[in-house]
A protein has these predicted regions:
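C-terminal helical subdomain
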Residues: 176, 195-230, 235-239
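Residue(s) in the substrate-gating loop at a strand-loop-helix junction
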Residues: 137
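Conserved glycine-rich cofactor-binding loop
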Residues: 11, 18-19
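Short C-terminal tail/terminal secondary-structure segment
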Residues: 2, 142, 231-249
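Substrate-binding pocket helix/loop in short-chain dehydrogenase/reductase
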Residues: 92-105, 196, 200
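Alpha-helical segment proximal to the catalytic Tyr-Lys
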Residues: 121, 165-170, 228
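Active-site helix of classical SDR
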Residues: 116, 153, 161
Length: 249
């Protein structure tokens, strides 16, 4: 018998999902039959017609709470929340302004906390509970030059994942994915042209950058009954990690 994951009748919210990793995650849930809800600060022109879109700036706690309430009001339930909204431009650690640092922590840590709190509130009232998946980064578990505040926020997100998983069990499972380098439509801004992207990919044991949909595949598993005994986990999705420097010395 083939093993399949069917999300028919399930409602999944992916934050920051109009492009990049979030778009790939949302697509995989759609492929599995879920009712897909996405949010971002601005709508995208090319979203599938059957995806629901809500505009929200999740750095604002009240806006984040209102988003979750609106999704539940529109659909009657929320089964899976994927806290994907985040990111950081290169920022010099020694000269980053307080405003930049504050906004990076708001986006990469506090937004997920706000959404998770209100999602848990609703999921605890559902007979089937729910699942929360936090998209973290390998920057949380290794030095993060030029993205120090981002890495610190993601490290905090990993701790929040473990703590909330403990407190909200057994009704709600909470897991994180520490993603490595991913080939999004903006990969060239970080890694350069095709040759640069290939060179960076060659430093990974699997020889390439991840695709957004591959992070989506992990999310589909973590949100499903197949992961019913998985909570408080941090999945390293980094293609084997970056090769140690001594190998190229």
């Amino acid at each position: 018998m083939a093993v399949t994951i069917d999300y028919s009748g399930k409602v999944v919210l992916v934050t920051g999902a109009t492009k990049g990793v979030g778009r790939g995650i949302a697509q995989r849930f759609a492929d599995a039959g879920a009712t897909v809800v996405v949010c971002a600060r601005k709508p995208a022109d090319d979203l599938p017609a059957d995806w629901q879109f809500f505009a929200a700036d999740l750095r604002d706690g009240e806006a984040a709470f209102a988003l979750i309430d609106s999704v539940v009001a529109a659909n009657g339930r929320l089964d899976v929340l994927v806290n994907n909204a985040g990111g950081s431009p290169p920022v010099d650690t020694s000269t980053a302004s307080p405003r930049i640092t504050e906004r990076l922590v708001q986006l990469n840590l506090l937004a997920a906390i706000y959404c998770s709190q209100q999602a848990n509130h609703h999921m605890q009232q559902q007979a089937t509970g729910g699942a929360i998946i936090n998209i973290s980064s390998v920057c949380a578990v290794r030095p993060s030059p030029t993205t120090a505040a981002y890495g610190a926020a993601k490290a905090g997100l990993n701790n929040y994942t473990a703590t909330s998983a403990l407190e909200w069990a057994p009704k709600v499972r909470v897991n994180s994915i520490s993603a490595g380098m991913i080939r999004t439509e903006q990969a060239h801004l970080f890694y350069g042209d095709e040759a640069g992207i290939a060179a960076v990919g060659a430093t990974v044991p699997l020889g390439r950058l991840a695709l957004p949909t591959e992070i989506g595949d992990i999310c589909v598993y973590l949100g499903s009954p197949m992961a019913s005994y998985v909570t408080g986990a941090n999945v390293l999705a980094h293609g084997g990690g970056e090769s140690p420097a001594f190998l190229s010395a």
